[in-house]
From Swiss-Prot:
InterPro entries: HPr, HPr-like, HPr-like_sf, PTS_HPr_His_P_site, PTS_HPr_Ser_P_site. PROSITE patterns: PTS_HPR_DOM, PTS_HPR_HIS, PTS_HPR_SER. General (non sugar-specific) component of the phosphoenolpyruvate-dependent sugar phosphotransferase system (sugar PTS). This major carbohydrate active-transport system catalyzes the phosphorylation of incoming sugar substrates concomitantly with their translocation across the cell membrane. The phosphoryl group from phosphoenolpyruvate (PEP) is transferred to the phosphoryl carrier protein HPr by enzyme I. Phospho-HPr then transfers it to the PTS EIIA domain. Residues 1-89 form the HPr domain. It comes from the Bacteria. It is found in: Cytoplasm. Belongs to the HPr family. The keyword Ribosomal protein does not apply. The active site is at H15 (pros-phosphohistidine intermediate). This is Phosphocarrier protein HPr. It comes from Pseudomonas putida. Keywords: Cytoplasm, Phosphotransferase system, Sugar transport, Transport.
């Protein structure tokens, strides 16, 4: 089960559009994608409402886990999305 702590770096944080992109990428994979602001308080990364409720602004550290089939591929895709500013430019 891959796990990473990663910083939200885009200017608007994990707002509605960014959360929708995150959930869209997570949904492409059959594995579970728990994510949260603390390692013991994880939510379903495939739920738009759960991801938006994290209220993760710019600079927030999030704990990202993947477990199951294609978990490494899912982790790589989600980390790439976050590191590419959710394809929003900054």
């Amino acid at each position: 089960m891959p796990a990473r702590e990663i910083t939200i770096i885009n200017k608007l944080g994990l707002h509605a559009r960014a959360a929708a992109k995150f959930v869209g990428v997570a949904g492409r994979f059959p594995c579970q994608v728990p994510v949260g602001r603390a390692p013991d308080k994880l939510v379903d990364g495939k739920s738009i409402m759960a991801v938006m409720m994290l209220a993760a602004g710019k600079g927030t550290q999030v704990h990202l886990h993947t477990x199951g089939e294609q978990d490494s591929d899912a982790m790589d895709a989600l980390v790439e999305l976050i590191n590419n500013f959710f394809d929003e430019g900054e």
